[in-house]
From Swiss-Prot:
One of its GO terms (molecular function) is molecular adaptor activity. It is found in: Cytoplasm, Cytoskeleton, Microtubule organizing center, Centrosome; Cytoplasm, Cytoskeleton, Microtubule organizing center, Centrosome, Centriolar satellite; Cytoplasm, Cytoskeleton, Cilium basal body. This is TBC1 domain family member 31. The keyword Transferase does not apply. Pfam families: RabGAP-TBC, WD40. Molecular adapter which is involved in cilium biogenesis. Part of a functional complex including OFD1 a centriolar protein involved in cilium assembly. Could regulate the cAMP-dependent phosphorylation of OFD1, and its subsequent ubiquitination by PJA2 which ultimately leads to its proteasomal degradation. Residues 698-852, 892-951, 1050-1077 form a coiled coil. GO terms for biological process: cilium assembly. PROSITE patterns: TBC_RABGAP, WD_REPEATS_1, WD_REPEATS_2, WD_REPEATS_REGION. It comes from Xenopus laevis. Its main location: cytoplasm. The lineage of its organism: Eukaryota, Metazoa, Chordata, Craniata, Vertebrata. Residues 355-383 are annotated as: Disordered. GO terms for cellular component: centriolar satellite; centrosome; ciliary basal body; cytoplasm. Residues 432-607 form the Rab-GAP TBC domain.
Amino acid sequence: MQTTDLGNKEYGKIWHRKPSPSTNEGIIVNIVHVDASHLSKSTRFLQAAFDSAGDCFLAGDHLGNVYMFNLNRNRFDLVQKTMQACTAIAFNLHRKTEFLVALADNSVKCFDAGAKELVSWMRGHESAVTSISIHASGRYAVTTSSDTAQLWDLDTFQRKRKLNVRQSVGIQKVFFLPLSNTILSCFKDDSIFAWESDTLACKYQLPIPEDETKLHYKAFAITRDGRMLAAGGKSKNLHLWCLDSKQLFRIIQMPAKVRSVQQLEFLPDNFDGGSSQILGVLSQDGIMRFINIQTCKLVFDIGNPDNRVVTSSVSPNGRYITSVMENGSLNIYSVQALSKELNKPPPPLVKMVDLSKDKDSTGNKSGVSRASQEKVRVSSGRTCRPWKTKDPIVRTKYLRPEDTTASEDKENALPAGLNKPRLQAMLKGFGEYPAKYRMFIWRSLLQLPENHAAFSSLLDKGTHSQYKLLHQEYPIKSRKLLRVLQRTLSALAHWSAIFGETKYLPLLAFPFVKLFQNNQLICFEVVATVITNWCQHWFEYFPNPPINILGMVENLLAHHDKELLQHFINHGVNSQVYAWPILETLFSEVLTREEWLRLFDNVFSNHPSFLLMAVVSYIISSRSPLLHCNQKDDFEYFFHHRNNLDISNMIREAYHLMDTSPAEIHPQRLLSDFEPLTRGQYPIFNKYPKFIVDYQGQERERIRQEEMEYLRERQLTQEVEAEAVKRRLEDQAWYQQQELLKGAEEQRRKLLMDEEQKLLHQRQRLATVKRELRLKELQLLDAARRRFLRYQQDQRKMELRRLDDEIERKVSLREQETATIVKDVEIRQMELEAQRRFFEQQLAKEQEAVTQDMKGELDANRRRADLEEQMFWRLMETEEDLKDQKLLEESLAKAERLCVETDWKIQSLQKQKCDDWERGKRYEEISKLTEDVQEKERELCNVLKDMETRKWAEVSQKMTELEREKLAGSAQQAQRQQFLQEKLRQEAGPIDISGEDGNEYFERLRDLNRSSMQKDFSSSDEQHVPENVCLNDVSASDSSTHFSLDRGRGELERGERALISEVRELRQKLASQAHKKYPHLHFSQTSWS
């Protein structure tokens, strides 16, 4: 094993001697990167990725260095220094020198490996990018992180769409399916969705496995044809999904050493049609095992417990595997060396002949070489476990010989002693027949009958009408070659009418005509044999191309190279573009002479289906330049011109296609075996739509007749035209003489006309000058008039502007004055209203204070009356006749109280109604003159002062009356107390009042009297507070608890109403004066509350 240290070199050789990988390890070279300044430190490689061809790969280390390794040229180059560790690399973009690198700062950068420069910088991820998937066209990329996946356009490097998921779900991987526009997204909950990359609409979802079969997917791999998905995770089982049926069709169980799967990779094979059978499984032990998913056998493995594999990348051509090892180095493996043991031929089978008549015993006694072989049972949907077998047994199946030996010998026997199998063996050995004997071998293989008489009869019919003008359509330099081609095509057209209508027949027959131009019979029969055998079913859809044959070619291409067919479909290229041009010329346009001869050595030596296989082989062998074609014109040019091609590889590929194509699509199933031409007379060729050919023949005959008629008419026309020319010449001479006479006359007349024209011209000039002078004069007058009109218009505009300014100034002044007056009036009104509200508030406060005093006094009197009543009724408990009276008095007092309260409520409602009615009749706000308003306000103040004096006089009078009433009440209270004390002394025994209770009662009564006296003194001191509420004293003779409330507000309300009426009258007077003085002022109605 070779080891290469990159050191500080930026370029160099990968290996220094020719690598010879062993079959055990298969390592071509081990690449390490040791820092020269610190020998103990080595740079660790992190990621690696191959290009689309599979011969170059990129590798990035943890310092941000990206190296490109070219395994064909044995060279490495340092293409970029990113200064950051890379987390993912992709190297299969549509521009072959560009690559994508995902860095540790969550960004993705695009670099050019050739120019070693930055192309674009893509941001958008919030966490590290774990994978990059490129579309088959190389123009789109999907980058995946743990929380999001983003779709990028690699032409503009703009983000097209973004896939977000809940944090609880998370994304495992998002990638493109090969050969399709489908994006597969795999999430951490084992759900897998397929999306259309153009519209990003969900196409389908794979069913989530049941709990007992869940693997918690972490690794995924897809086959090249995009039909099978392998998934693995935290288990030793692998799930294989069929994406066509969207079902889990197989579960593979790995060995017991495998506990979890870290990475999955399919190993491509050039001959599996994209359905890869070898799957690489990287497990937790660092060993990557490659297994056959059909037989569940271990093919080979890489890595070991001492130096584990971290990640691996498989080349698209299946030749190399690049692995990043645990120690940071890079191993390059040769798949051919690793699978050499697998590709060895089986050991020779030694059998013993048993003379026993029993066939079964003979089979059982035969000795078999002992070869270690593990048989594994694989069933759909179940884990695959190996059978426990003892000695492996190889059973031999004896086939009964069929009675076909004679027929096969007859078929293989050729004239002149040649044998077809021997010719085929020689052809496989040398690749071609000897040039000296090629024509002889071809004649033998084609078994030409050499029917001289039949061919002469065809030649005697002459040149076919369809090919009389062949030299115009195909200008061939050699007259002999043109003549032979014309005769051969005419003979074919006379043999079968279809060949007179076939446009491509000259292209098909020309290479054989050029090859057999010295023997026209052989040339005709070779072309006829090719048409009858290798052009089977070509004319069934005439005049259209053979759709059935082209369908066979397309089916073969779809099976063996689906990617190339999809490329054709994507660019609108069908089989009539990539297959029919080759068939209709029999490869003569795309191959050189020597290549064409080698190809037809093999075509004539095999079944007629080999020609179709050769077409498919040519297309597949040219897949690389075809995949680079993007325009339909490029494809058409490619299939009509010669291209660089290894004919040997193409022929080998054709034989491979013959052997590996399934029977259902193999052309051999639909094409008949080789049948030579019959001797004596040529066979009838009528495998074409006869009515179409007959119709075209009739149409051609009709056209020929019309052409003959046209020629006769043209002959007559020419004769008439000759006579007409003769007469025309005579007429022309006479006309010339007449023209000379007319010329002389015209010359004289022209002189007269010139003079007249000169005179007329002078008059016209004079009239023109006069008209111009008149026009100038009119223009000057019009300009003067317009200037004067503009002057007048400007003067009027200025006058109008002055008037408008004056009007605007006066209106503005009037509006300002009006607004000032209105504001003054509003302010005065607001002041009056505020003053009125202030007075009302003062009155309400005073009224509230009086009401509170009266409430306190009433409460004291009520409590005192209750005590007295309680004491009195205690004294009168023995008199039962007073109980009824007490009840009646209580009821009467309650009725009187309710009556008084009802009257009070009625009065308040009436007052409120009156106030509302008066408020609704208030007049509009008007402007008042300042002096009148002040005078009226002084009058109003005087009236208010008079009313205030009168009111205070009334208040003093009522206070005097209140004092008298209080004194009278105090005297009556003293009498009642004295009376009660005397009664208590007289009847101390029956009442049985304890001393303590009596003392308590008198103390309470004394407290109530004292509080009432204090209130009386305080009310008498405050002489400025009006007393609007009065209490009627309870009569001494009345022993009931009833007392009457007289609010005493009637006189105050009447005074207030009189004051308000005077204010209204005053406002009416002011409003009438204002209307008389300013009749044009109008104010909006304003209601004040």
